Amino acid sequence: MLEEKIAVATGASRGIGRAIAKELALKGAFVIVNYNGSKQAADETVNEITQAGGKAVGVQCNVADAAECEAFINNIISEYGRIDILVNNAGIVRDNLLMRISEKDFDAVIDTNLKGTFHTMRLVARPMLRQRSGRIINISSVVGIFGNAGQANYAASKAGVIG
């Protein structure tokens, strides 16, 4: 179904991102397993994919950093020729009550969850238009609609992804 497709999954070293990466590979895509913090966790995801007969490689990029994202996306396109599927899944939490949350923690969540999604979408949009195909899938959360105590920053970031 996805044979010959190049898929990028951000935040794919564990959790939902790992499950997404494995499913993309199961359907035949070559998966770029993006991670920021844990190379070991990304390697585990890649190993699970390859042991099941799929193809994947782990690539580090902090999606909150626009320059890192630009290098990340440009390197993938340079090496593989295109990106067919982008799944924006990278996300962090810095939970605290609104009156106690620091601006640094608020910004960290917005920068990763919302701006990281923007960075990667902006960078793949033009190449996808040129190739006249491509899919962008943004993972959000019900918290972006209903909120959650202690997660004002997370709720704002996920509401932004929903649009």
Outline where the language-model segments fall:
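Substrate-binding pocket helix/loop in short-chain dehydrogenase/reductase
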Residues: L97-L98, S102-I110, I136
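Active-site "substrate specificity/gating" loop of NAD(P)-dependent dehydrogenases
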Residues: I101, G147-Q151
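Residue(s) in the substrate-gating loop at a strand-loop-helix junction
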Residues: S141
